[in-house]
Amino acid sequence: MNIKDALALVVNGKDLSVEQMTDVMREVMTGKATDAQRGAFLVALRIKSETLDEITGAAKVMRELATKVVVNADNLVDTCGTGGDGANLFNVSTASAFVVAAAGGHVAKHGNRSVSSSTGSADVLEAAGVNLQMPADQVARAIETIGVGFMFAPAHHSAMKHAIGPRKELGLRTIFNMLGPMTNPAGVKNQVIGVFTKALCRPMAEVLGRLGSEHVLVVHSEDGLDELSIAAPSHVAEYHKGNVTEYTLSPADVGIEMQSLEGLGVATAEESLALINGAFAGSDEPAAQKAAAIIALNAGAAIYVSGLATSFKDGVAMAEDALATGAAREKLKELVEFSAL
């Protein structure tokens, strides 16, 4: 199916099959469609609401066209979010990656520069001194030897260049906001994904199950974060062993004290890095203590889905240990040094 035929269906409220969506996305991602067609298609899909089949088909094409990172490691996991929650918190999922590595996991962190927030994962890692342009084989070695590596999305999804213009000009959330976390170049099968609305939790968990994932938590907090929050309960859709289970999780359920988010907002990558460094150093500043708590909560989730812990609560305890010993700080230092080689 070509994009013109697909547009005719979608604008009339008709859904596309997985096969039809893969045909159209290949036109979008290979430059065959015009900017006008790409923009119209993205908006029409958004207005109609994307179905599981459409999201699945689009994700398949992005995965197919990605520059792969082949990693030989157990417990491979990713921590990421869709962004777009408007909270402007420091980079929680990025910080969590180093804690998971310090606990013995292997994190294939996939991310980009900021689109809607103050700072994206790439921005804060660059501020820390990480070389974002590492080739795929070096990223794989980092994951295997250090336990964490960063895959800069534009370097691995070059086909995205065909969608950048329309996305920027539209200024709207589109299907691409969902696709980023579902198209990890290392093919991770265990993930913690934060989303900007509760309505996405179950659909994304179901799509990832269709795409071969093993253990996934898709989360959205009641105070609006695309993370697990320390200030409110969070909605969780957990995919594991072929089933999706939905539940509400309070920080206290896994041993984290409920507390406000005051002091965790940032305006720049440097401010985000300062909070992360404070948390990693065990600072007794109130903001650093809160940062450590929300990092431990989210890292604990990733440790759990990676298989390193048998329960979410045990994962959080392992994350707290990794922070307390300074091991997480060492992992960040190791990645900075390794990326400069």
Curated annotation (Swiss-Prot):
A GO term, aspect molecular function: anthranilate phosphoribosyltransferase activity
Cellular compartments per GO CC: cytosol
Role according to the record: Catalyzes the transfer of the phosphoribosyl group of 5-phosphorylribose-1-pyrophosphate (PRPP) to anthranilate to yield N-(5'-phosphoribosyl)-anthranilate (PRA).
Keyword DNA repair annotated: no
Subunit note: Homodimer.
Catalytic activity: N-(5-phospho-beta-D-ribosyl)anthranilate + diphosphate = 5-phospho-alpha-D-ribose 1-diphosphate + anthranilate
Residues binding Mg(2+) 1, per UniProt: S93, E227
E.C. designation(s): 2.4.2.18
Binding site residues for Mg(2+) 2: D226, E227
Family of this protein: Belongs to the anthranilate phosphoribosyltransferase family.
Pathway, per record: Amino-acid biosynthesis; L-tryptophan biosynthesis; L-tryptophan from chorismate: step 2/5
Pfam family membership, one: Glycos_trans_3N
Names of the cofactor(s): Mg(2+)
Residues that coordinate or bind anthranilate 1: G81, N112
Organism: Saccharophagus degradans (strain 2-40 / ATCC 43961 / DSM 17024)
Swiss-Prot/TrEMBL keywords: Amino-acid biosynthesis, Aromatic amino acid biosynthesis, Glycosyltransferase, Magnesium, Metal-binding, Transferase, Tryptophan biosynthesis
Single GO biological process annotation from the record: L-tryptophan biosynthetic process
Protein name per its UniProtKB record: Anthranilate phosphoribosyltransferase
Cofactor-binding details, from the entry: Binds 2 magnesium ions per monomer.
